[in-house]
Amino acid sequence: MFGVAVASSSPTVAARCAFANAGIGAVATQNITDPSKGPRVLNLLKSQADALEAIETLQDSSDFIEYRQILVVDREGGTAIHSGKHTLGTWGEAATKNAAAAGNLLADKSVPRTMINAFEETENSDLHLTDRLMIAMRAGNDAGSEEGPIHSAGIKIVDDMPWPIVDLRVDWTDDCPIDALDALWARYKPQRDDYVTRALDPTSAPSYGLPGDT
């Protein structure tokens, strides 16, 4: 299972920045982002490159790579991060096996390390990966987050299916987007497995419980 969680002062951040493929890995493209780098890295991972090799390939062959901040987790839990010299404002990065965190325009460069610490603290729990990433993202927010207010957030999770089993976004709010995303997850979580069942075997799927659904 792989996932990406992201929050930003910019609108619709997850639409541009979160990429993951089941059995392959996860990628976040940040800063002055180029969304094409997400699928490209996933293709490199699919071709048996590890996280570091994928980052090194981008560094050697991509235009404007110094404007990008790219995080990779590969199928073995290996991690790599590229933060170019034009990464905006105060920036930071941190990684451990199975997880990487980075940010720009931060209130404090220690924010990513705080996120990794929070993620590691839930390692032996029964929490779903979505919950673990939400906890890490909230820890980063509590540690200062961006220097200015954040307005959008999203989370994407892949597992055994060729589509994301969780793909939730708050594209803009004047309130805390992490709170809004957490509320959306709380609503979706009890139904998550039912939507997979409806895709694989509609005859055994539960009713939607909506007017007109018989």
Per-region residue spans from a language model:
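N-terminal nucleophile
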Residues: 1-214
